Amino acid sequence: MRLRLGVLLVALVAAVPALAAGPSVEGNAYLVQNGTTGEVLLSWNAREQLPIASITKLMTVLVALEHVQLGDIVTVSGRAASIGESSIHLRRGERISVRDLIEAALIQSANDAALALAEGAGGSVAHFVELMNEKAAALGLDDTHFANPDGLDAPGHYSSARDVTRLARIAMKKRVIARIVAKEESSISGNRRLSTWNDLLSTFPGTFGVKTGHTAAAGWSEVAAARAHGVTIYATLLGSPARRVRNDDLTELLAWGLTRYRLVTLISKERVYAVARAPFGRAPLELKVPSEVRRFVRVDRSLVERVVAPEGVSLPVRAGQQLGEVRVYRGSKLLASRPLVATRSIAKPGLFGRAGWYAGQAAHNAWSWVT
């Protein structure tokens, strides 16, 4: 067997600046993460416990979906109807579906909808908050603790940029949540028209969520997600001083993150990785992989390819038979591997065939010696 090493030059390495300092951001904490692999690209104060305002409603909806169905009906309590700040003006005794409450909580960031949802799913706000904290612990959100389902400022209500990003990625796995947070507007019962607070949905191409938040203590905060050319990036910014500043900084963070990756064919099924000698005068045997591997890789990282293949083969060989392997590494980490297989079958000659070949070789050698 032989081992061949090579360096794969990732496309556009020279065209994109190396991962130097990211954009200048105003705020208390931020984090930029690959939404597919979870790789953190950039962060600052990512573990600091901070108020997160209405980003809380991602957990509210996530927990509610474990206890009620979208078509269930909730009767609005006086407490829910009277809560202040952002609301859809629910009325005490009003009957409204869980689906409508979720849309109002995620799009309009309605506090009354979040409270009604918590009461409908948990029986009481206090019990529902317990469920929220249990869920946070189960998800490994170690920097997080909830005191209410709406996100209004309260002692003991906090999270971190790291946890918020993780929560958003988990919540987006729920189709109903992913569909709702991508909407700029919606209509629900009671002739209510909902409008999103997420300005990036209309200003930054590829944005598909997820949740904003604003209170006096939390400042202007948001976890946003955008996709371009097959790359998904999440960016969380907590404690920005103004809505415009938050939007501008998140735009920079998302754009920065999206330029860090390219989709690269690490292992190609069209490429001949090795050619092995075949005995008895047979044509050399090309070795390929049965399937290719395409991955998103950082544009500033070089990859090492290792090809393990035989110099020659023994017959018979069948098409598809594994004879070697291709591996691609980033540093010491194995990113991909595929078997090297024969591209055609080669039968072993019979006794007379082998004898004839040996005789021909002997005659050729003798003639070469004479001449």
Which stretches of residues belong to each language-model region?
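Active-site-adjacent loops and short helices of periplasmic peptidoglycan-processing enzymes
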Residues: 20-175
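Domain-terminus/edge residues, biased toward the C-terminal soluble/receptor-binding domains
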Residues: 153-158, 162-371
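Bacterial N-terminal signal peptides
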Residues: 6-17
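Positively charged n-region of N-terminal signal peptides that target proteins for export
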Residues: 1-5
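Generic detector of short alpha-helix boundary/capping microenvironments
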Residues: 8-10, 25-26, 48-49, 81, ...
